[in-house]
Amino acid sequence: YAPNATVDFVNVAIVDWGSKCQSETENYLSAHPDTDYIISIYDSATQYIVPAVKSTGSSAKIVAYNGTPFAVDYVKSGDIEMLIGEDLLTIAYATVDYEMRTDLGMTQVEEPTLYRVWTSENVDEALNADGKCEYGIGYGDSAKQAYEKIWGLS
């Protein structure tokens, strides 16, 4: 909680990320050199935000959401401070479970999907043998086991 924090927004449409995200971030950081954090609602935009922070010499830290492998690699390299990742396999299982229950007229159940906060302290758990992140690593397999048991697949 930061009662004295101020928040500004720099909105760049997804279709414009490649042409505007870096320059808009650079312009903002140049005008606001005391910026502490940049929050990217989609981590795919960080491929443009990271170079902007570096080119301006800003000390702003980057945090983001999604868990896209290259963004998790940015956590490993220290370019992103924190990333909230979602397990796509769990989301896929939950989606199929919902659709199957609907088709079979079964009662729906509330099923949380898995999220994990990636930082420099735990990011190695998301890496494969080559030291790169890939989807599905680092979230465990409890959801897969549970869905397979529910649907008689194990």
Label each residue range with its predicted role.
Residues 1-154:
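A residue-level marker of the well-folded mature domains of exported/periplasmic proteins
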